[in-house]
């Protein structure tokens, strides 16, 4: 007998089935951690609420993690969101700069600037309802920060998740939309190493008596106010 190789053709329904599957994946893609928040005008005012829900979900999912929120122009609104949405079992680190924002440049001389407003928001920490989370705010040199990110690692330092933000959360939806892009797991270790190097070189630099970074707020240094006894 004689064997013959090849000559097999798929049944007619096979390519059609693949075509349908691919089309369904395009129309109904698997839900990712990425988000797009339109401006308030383009979302009938809903995008701000959706953003708050997204942040709340991130903080609750990582309720006992170490979370770094990096924003060169962090404002008091961001601190308020951390306090409202953060958990008491996580550690939060805000990394920002003391660079003047565009709003600062148009303020009157006697008006508080961005950083002053931020610290004023922290001044009532552990006073009543405000300030239930463990928070540090690190100010680094202007040139060290550009991107806005939220980076999450476990208590033992293992990277868990990361998100790149197209603009500042506190300004999101006012004039520009906000795109949140998950950082791929194979890239996250490099991002953490980059941020750790910024902290190490500016806050703990060996042999430099004039370190350019400083912790401008640490909730651990604030003692809770004693409540009056009836």
Q: Which residues does each PLM region occupy?
A:
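PLD/PLD-like phosphodiesterase catalytic module centered on the HKD motif
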Residues: 1-48, 56, 61, 73, ...
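Structural motif
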Residues: 66-68, 161
């Amino acid at each position: 007998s004689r064997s013959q190789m090849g000559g097999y053709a798929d049944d007619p329904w096979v390519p059609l089935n693949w075509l349908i599957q691919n089309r369904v994946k395009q129309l109904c893609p698997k839900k990712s951690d990425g988000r797009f928040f339109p401006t308030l005008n383009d979302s009938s005012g809903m995008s701000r609420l959706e953003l708050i829900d997204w942040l709340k979900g991130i903080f609750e999912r990582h309720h006992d993690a170490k979370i770094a929120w990096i924003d060169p122009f962090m404002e008091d609104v961001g601190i308020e969101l951390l306090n409202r949405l953060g958990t008491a079992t996580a550690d939060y680190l805000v990394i920002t700069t003391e660079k003047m924002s565009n709003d600062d440049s148009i303020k009157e001389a006697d008006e508080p600037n961005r950083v002053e407003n931020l610290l004023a928001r922290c001044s009532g920490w552990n006073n009543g309802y405000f300030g239930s989370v463990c928070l540090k705010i690190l100010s680094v040199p202007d040139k060290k920060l550009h991107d806005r990110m939220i980076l999450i690692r476990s208590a033992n330092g293992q990277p868990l998740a990361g998100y790149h933000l197209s603009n500042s959360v506190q300004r999101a939806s006012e004039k520009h939309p906000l795109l949140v892009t998950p950082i791929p797991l194979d890239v996250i270790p490099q991002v953490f190493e980059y941020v750790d190097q910024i902290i190490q070189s500016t806050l703990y630099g060996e042999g430099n008596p004039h370190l350019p970074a400083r912790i401008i707020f640490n909730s651990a240094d604030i003692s809770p106010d004693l409540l009056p006894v009836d």
